[in-house]
């Protein structure tokens, strides 16, 4: 889970943004003492910073300058002022993006996701091949292979399988899968997820693996190991 440090002194707006971001599976931290922003930044060690221009004690530009001198963490500025100079200043200080208040929450999410794609390189792994139930799961080639043969998956099917394997023997909710797909810009609906899982299971049947992807009614899905079955 990515950690976000939200540096916003408007408590109402802070809690509104935090609640929405938490719903997208981000871990959101705030600032307790606005004279100690740098120390609190170091303590949290966030994956992303969202910072308002206007803050108590020192403005956001001051803290951006100090944070950027110590870290390459993505920084997104918020501002209620309609001043082009604010955007120019934020970029000159090393911020990655800027959004003016009031803003639509979907725009904020899109900007955060874009920063993570640029900086953290979504979906890059040291190895794209995993093993599961005696099969090789090649995420780069979208292939699953075992001694029964090989099947080719679509990108969405492979993405879903990877998410389930990474949490094997644990229930992954439908909501979590949909959020993950949206985070990766694979825009799917609830019905589309059902279709993809059913299609994935049918393809895995050719390798005698379909039964290892189990539906938990009202909860989600689970990728089981060969020796772990559930009632």
UniProtKB/Swiss-Prot annotation:
PTM summary: Phosphorylated by BceS.
Alphabetical list of SUPFAM superfamilies matching this protein: C-terminal effector domain of the bipartite response regulators, CheY-like
Encoding gene, per UniProt annotation: bceR
Transmembrane segments: none
Gene Ontology terms: biological process: regulation of DNA-templated transcription
Record-given protein name: Sensory transduction protein BceR
DNA-binding region: 127-225
Main location: cytoplasm
Ranges for domain Response regulatory: 3-116
Residue numbers of 4-aspartylphosphate PTMs: 52
Compartments reported by the entry: Cytoplasm
Source organism superkingdom: Bacteria
Lineage: Bacteria, Bacillati, Bacillota, Bacilli, Bacillales
Task performed by this protein: Member of the two-component regulatory system BceS/BceR involved in the regulation of bacitracin resistance. When activated by BceS, binds to the upstream region of the bceAB promoter and up-regulates the expression of these two genes.
GO cellular component, one term: protein-DNA complex
Pfam families in UniProt: Response_reg, Trans_reg_C
Origin species: Bacillus subtilis (strain 168)
Entries under InterPro entries matching the protein: CheY-like_superfamily, OmpR/PhoB-type_DNA-bd, Sig_transdc_resp-reg_C-effctor, Sig_transdc_resp-reg_receiver, WalR-like, WH-like_DNA-bd_sf
Keywords (A to Z) from UniProt: Cytoplasm, DNA-binding, Phosphoprotein, Transcription, Transcription regulation, Two-component regulatory system
MF annotations from Gene Ontology: phosphorelay response regulator activity; transcription cis-regulatory region binding
Signal peptide: none
């Amino acid at each position: 889970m990515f950690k976000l440090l939200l540096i916003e002194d408007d408590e109402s707006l802070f809690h509104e943004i935090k609640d929405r971001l938490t719903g997208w599976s981000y871990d959101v931290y705030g600032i307790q003492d606005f004279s100690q922003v740098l120390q609190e930044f170091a303590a949290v060690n966030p994956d992303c910073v969202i910072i308002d221009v206007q803050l108590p004690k020192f403005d956001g530009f001051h803290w951006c300058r100090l944070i950027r001198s110590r870290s390459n963490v993505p920084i997104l500025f918020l501002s209620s002022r309609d001043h082009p100079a604010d955007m120019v200043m934020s970029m000159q200080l090393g911020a990655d993006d800027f959004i003016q208040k009031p803003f639509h929450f979907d725009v904020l999410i899109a900007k955060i996701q874009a920063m993570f794609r640029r900086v953290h390189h979504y979906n890059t792994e040291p190895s794209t091949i995993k093993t599961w139930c005696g099969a090789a799961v090649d995420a780069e080639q979208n292939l699953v292979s075992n001694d029964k043969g090989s099947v080719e998956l679509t990108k969405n099917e492979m993405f879903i399988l990877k998410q389930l394997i990474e949490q094997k023997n644990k229930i992954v909710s439908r909501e979590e899968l949909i959020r993950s797909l949206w985070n990766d810009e694979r825009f799917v609906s609830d019905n589309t997820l059902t279709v993809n899982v059913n299609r994935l299971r049918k393809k895995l049947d050719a390798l005698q693996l379909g039964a290892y992807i189990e539906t938990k009614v009202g909860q989600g899905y689970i990728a089981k190991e060969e020796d772990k079955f559930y009632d």
